[in-house]
Amino acid sequence: MKLSSTTRDKIMNEADKAKVPFSSNNIRLSVGEWIIAAIVCTALLCLGPALWGRIEKFDPGADYRLPYTLGNDYWLYGRNCRWACSKYDTLVVGDSVIWGHYVSADNTLSHYLNQNAAQDRFANLGVDGFHPAALGGLLRYYGGDISGKNVIIQFNPLWMSSAKHDLQTEKEFRFNHPKLVPQFFPRIPCYKDSFSKRFSAAVERYVPFFGWASHLRIVYFENIDLSNWTLEHPYENPLGAVTLELPISRDDDLQENVSWTEKGISQEDFQWVEPAQSLQWRFFRQTIDLLKARNNTVFVVVGPFNEHMLKPDSYKTYQKMKSEIQMWLQRNNVAYCVPPVLPSDLYRDASHPLGQGYAMLARQLFENQSFKSTILNVSGD
């Protein structure tokens, strides 16, 4: 059947009138619906992290330390800071030496400090792998609740044992916790991430929502984004993965009774970086200033470094470096202790004590006059 031109034109006109305006295939929202969506998104962005802190159970017990698997969960670290500040008068801050890399939670420095005090006064806020550049960022952006407290902060000389550890090599070096170091200034020579990654890291520090989203990914989705998680778990409900239960710190295969000599570790000839040239020492000094600016009473513990592990020339250089560090602390009226070197068999490696080593270190601190007057508020004889 052949349509006349008039009929065909009439049909085409009717079709044009019925055409849907150009748009995507997604559901279209009206102006009012867009406003509602914007309100919901804004509420989630602003209130989500705070509400989640009330929903997700976080009730640490004695000797709590951030689980090793959650070392990159800075949002949870901030939450832990708030909890610790409400329960303890003294916070012990530092890297894996404070965290207790080779010992159980009840063999750490904070545990033995509490044992010597005969009460729970000291909280373990150490995190595995936190060199001074990263620790400074962690406390600046996620440790704001640490204010008006006693703070024992440990400086590990290992971070000055080479230009690489000091982040000064021009060749790219993938160090721990790059999101926490200064992204643009001062320049860190070995840090080569793209501008977009640096900018994203800088923004995340100031927007709690991003830290919260990272927390959810790390705790519940195996530290991968949701789209990839659903690909790896096609038959699982993502909501079912959100159990509201945080992992606990496990003490599996710690080998805490194996010393460095029993492990067959040889003496080292470390190529120490002078304090005046050291980036890590510079960042550590800035962290002391930050803690003081927040009205904290700061006490620095230098070491305990395994000097038994040093070859003669390296040992001589280390003693000079240690003296320069002490001189700076004295000039700037920073209370400190450089504890005596522990017996060789109480070290696991260059900087980590074994359980008995932590017990001895705690006793050394309680016998130190500066520690007594600064942290224990006990006057000298």
Say what each PLM segment does.
Residues 1-89, 146-147, 381:
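N-terminal secretory targeting modules
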Residues 84-187:
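Membrane-embedded segments
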Residues 102-105, 311-316, 349-350:
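Short, solvent-exposed loop/turn segments at secondary-structure boundaries
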Residues 124-128, 302, 338-340:
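Residue-level recognition of beta-strand->loop/alpha-helix junctions
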Residues 284-299, 328-335:
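A structural motif corresponding to the C-terminal end of an alpha-helix
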Residues 349-381:
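Histidine-centered active-site loop/cap adjacent to the catalytic His
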